[in-house]
Amino acid sequence: MTGRTSSKRRVGSAAAVVTLALGGALAAAAPASAAGMNYKPISTATDVEVRVQSSGKCLEVADWRTDDGAPVRQWTCTGGDNQKWRFTDGYAVNVHSGKCLEIPGYSTAPAARADQWTCDKGANQRWGVVNDSQGSLAVVNFHSDLVLDVNSGTAADGAPAIQWYPTGVSNQRWYFNPSVVL
């Protein structure tokens, strides 16, 4: 009986070693954050549309809502104030609602959806940018070090804005209209 227990312990120990080794390999392969990127807070002197490169559509507060927690999404650009933003020291304030673009609950999870909330100067409401060689911008959340992304890269109206690992794809690249020097 002692021999059987001993071999079970050896098998269990070997499985733990394999699990730890695989877990270490998986952790090493996890996507990067923007922490190593040189990003700076956004400030604009005027109200701007924020357009995603992949679809050319605008970042907006859904349905002209003014409540805390209203979702932020992409939509065909209409020129409405719910699609205009003013950036001051990295805080994006929606012109229509007067509320800030944020990742709720200080989430650091990929795929967390962006919304608007009463501005409170939290790091989850602060955004920075990184320029690329083609003039588009990665918009980075100061708290999570993840980038603003249109979910699944779809061009559909209503696709939610989320945060995701920076990969440089066009649904993570943004333009300001009118163009601003950052």
Residue spans of the language-model regions?
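N-terminal compositionally biased, intrinsically disordered segments and leader/signal-like regions
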Residues: 3-6, 20, 45-47, 79, ...
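Extracellular glycan-recognition/adhesion modules and their associated mucin-like linkers
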Residues: 35-66, 82-108, 126-155, 173-182
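Secretory targeting and sorting signals
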Residues: 1-34
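Short, tandemly repeated low-complexity microdomains enriched for cysteine and small residues
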Residues: 66-86, 108-126, 155-168
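Short stretches within intrinsically disordered, low-complexity N-terminal or propeptide regions
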Residues: 18, 29-34, 47, 94, ...
